[in-house]
Amino acid sequence: MLQYQIDRIEHQITDDRSQTGVFLIGPLERGQATTLGNSLRRMLMGNLAGTAVTAVRIAGVNHEYATIPGVREDVLDILLNCKQLTVTSRTDELEIGRLIVSGPAVVKAKDLQFSSQVQVVDGERPIATVSEGHSLELEVHVERGVGYRPVDRHNEDTSAIDLLQIDAVFMPVHRVNFTTDETAVAEGGSARERLRMEVVTDGSMTPDDAIAQAANQLIELFQPLATVTMVEEPGIEPEPSAEAQIPLEELNLSVRAYNCLKRAQVNSVSDLMGFSYEDLLEIKNFGSKSADEVIEALERIGISIPQSRTSV
């Protein structure tokens, strides 16, 4: 199997702390670059776990269409700003961040006080603007998850009137692009390919970590296929061979042998395959000459039966 390597040729961190990594993967056999690119892209975009804001509680507010005295932004704007916060959590439990800010002030993500399990990635992201003589008291709920989770307004656990739910986007990878190109021709004239992949994350994880996690998930997904075992469904009998379906009449046996077998409820080759030579001799009026005749007839169509029951 062709051995390839992965090189990160570019890494950028923008003002909002999002990160971009560009990787070259190769050399690959023809067609493998597209296969690898599609598989990694699907895992990166839809299967990596991330952290997101799932609910917000604002003192004195019980619905998202309200306004807050002394705060420039309305509640919908504040919810949108909170939804765009980039945080990481090292626990699968619900974490809550709180702040109380008096004006005049621009309330930022870094003002939120979380436990040591949570880190705010972009602390300078604004949440609200508070005028002099006013204050803002805010509580933010963050959770870990995968993909996208819409608000469930029928969930009893989230039915508190002052807890404003947010559609949660847990995806830490914002964008994945890839291209393929041909590289040097290998010995024997077969062309090689190279995969160029660009990964953009929200800053809660590096592009390198995102690639590694996606690759490990693909390995876990495909590993069971390496040891496929056949399981017979209960109650389903295998199809009999064509020879087994041959009727007794087509074996051209003597009249004596044919009549004895018919009286013993033997109607086809399939029925005979359940007999041994000793079993044939136990059929009434069925002697060794008739038994030998049956053995020869079966051998002509490529079927043999055992001499005794113990050798079945």
Swiss-Prot record:
It catalyses: RNA(n) + a ribonucleoside 5'-triphosphate = RNA(n+1) + diphosphate. This is DNA-directed RNA polymerase subunit alpha. It comes from Synechococcus sp. (strain CC9311). Residues 1-229 are annotated as: Alpha N-terminal domain (alpha-NTD). Signal peptide: none annotated. DNA-dependent RNA polymerase catalyzes the transcription of DNA into RNA using the four ribonucleoside triphosphates as substrates. The lineage of its organism: Bacteria, Bacillati, Cyanobacteriota, Cyanophyceae, Synechococcales. InterPro entries: DNA-dir_RNA_pol_insert, DNA-dir_RNA_pol_RpoA/D/Rpb3, DNA-dir_RpoA, RBP11-like, RNAP_asu_C, RNApol_insert_sf. Residues 236-312 are annotated as: Alpha C-terminal domain (alpha-CTD). GO terms for biological process: DNA-templated transcription.
